[in-house]
Amino acid sequence: MLLGVIADDFTGATDIAGFLVENGMRTIQLNGIPTGDFEVAADAVVISLKSRSCPVDEAITDSVAGLKWLQAQGCQQFYFKYCSTFDSTAEGNIGPVTDALLAELGESFTMVCPALPVNGRTVYNGHLFVFGELLCDSGMRYHPVTPMTDSSVVRMMDAQSAGVSGLVNFQTIEQGSDAVTARLNELKAQGSRYAVVDAFNAEHLVTLGQAAKSLKLITGGSGLAAGIAKNWTKHLADQSDAKHAGSPVKAPTVVFSGSCSVMTNQQVALYKQLAPHFAIDVKACLTNDQYANEVFDWVMTHIQSEFAPLVYATAEATALKAIQEEYGAHASSHAVEQFFSQLAIKLQQNGVKNFIVAGGETSGVVTQSLAVKGFHIGPQIAPGVPWVRSVEGDLSLALKSGNFGDENFFAKAQSFFS
């Protein structure tokens, strides 16, 4: 085992796992920390947790437990994966988890690299942009759990962590990996614990990956994974078949959408023109014990459609706000996730093999409900969104973070069926 990744949510885990596979590392994703014997034959293992927005102490406990399991498997380098939009608050969880992992490893310095240029997440002079907009001006400022009202990664990291951040700017990065290494050493000597790095193109990430090869712990989004993988694949004999085990096959398929992001709204709107679709009634989720059974009947009447039936809770910002005000943000969200859980189980029991899911929380709930312990990582549908196939059984899933993929994502995912 070469690389161990601790991801703070399910879609983030498949995101980084997909980039590792695309760059030649045989990768398995585990849903939570294995208990008992679990044999892993891979170059990289990604543990997906649900620690992005849980209480800080819980996030630390779970992340450190994941690290200890990866250490026991002989991993040589570790990566703490969080969202490329740095989803967090002044309380955490990115900073506290980073500090806990450093302490557990006996290290005092790491890199902070949220950038994912291929999906429009770039860092320039320490400020995070989403498709050219400052993070605080993007749709992320309306996020219901972690509204992002700042764009300075240095400032955000320092607000939620025990150490001090320093910046490696793009001018240094464009001088090459030796210049970056020198700057990292300089920051470390100055007492910085975190090196926030600029990155707004793929070349920056390759350079940063080369400079990070001596770090025991790296933190960031999935963008840097390509550079890290390249460090390891130089020493691997066969990289040609890394994604084969995770490829999907044609079988009964359903699309779930629980995300309310701007891109998911666009994806749902386009897909509704192609496929049968069912909008979830939040009040029914809260009050009707048989609602999942009723929607199950609807899905099964459309399961043989040319395009898989869509069941969605996706709503635009104003509609979402109205729902939260009427039913409560937590209560409505929990009820919808429980609905997806019940529906997923019933569909699996009745022969549905492929699940396309939009939204990190929804993906986590569905994956847990289907009792999938781990995945082989397959081909990428879009940057950061691969098909994955269960290690045990014959389920395939496409787990999409809210804003990932283009407008045609749901239909494109189905073009991969063999």
Language model features with spans:
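Cap/lid and interdomain-hinge subdomains that line or gate substrate/regulatory clefts
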Residues: 1-2, 59, 67-205, 418
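N-terminal basic/disordered segments at the start of proteins
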Residues: 1-40, 59-63, 115-118
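General beta-strand structural signal in soluble alpha/beta enzymes
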Residues: 5-7, 28-30, 78-82, 110-114, ...
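Short acidic, glycine/serine/threonine-rich loops at helix termini
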Residues: 16-18, 90-94, 121-129, 179-180, ...
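A structural-propensity feature for long, helix-poor, extended segments
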Residues: 43-51, 305-307, 389-418
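Conserved, well-structured core segments that form the ligand-binding/active-site neighborhood
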Residues: 131-298
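C-terminal structural cap/anchor segments
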Residues: 299-358
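Conserved, well-ordered active-site substructure
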Residues: 352-353, 361-409
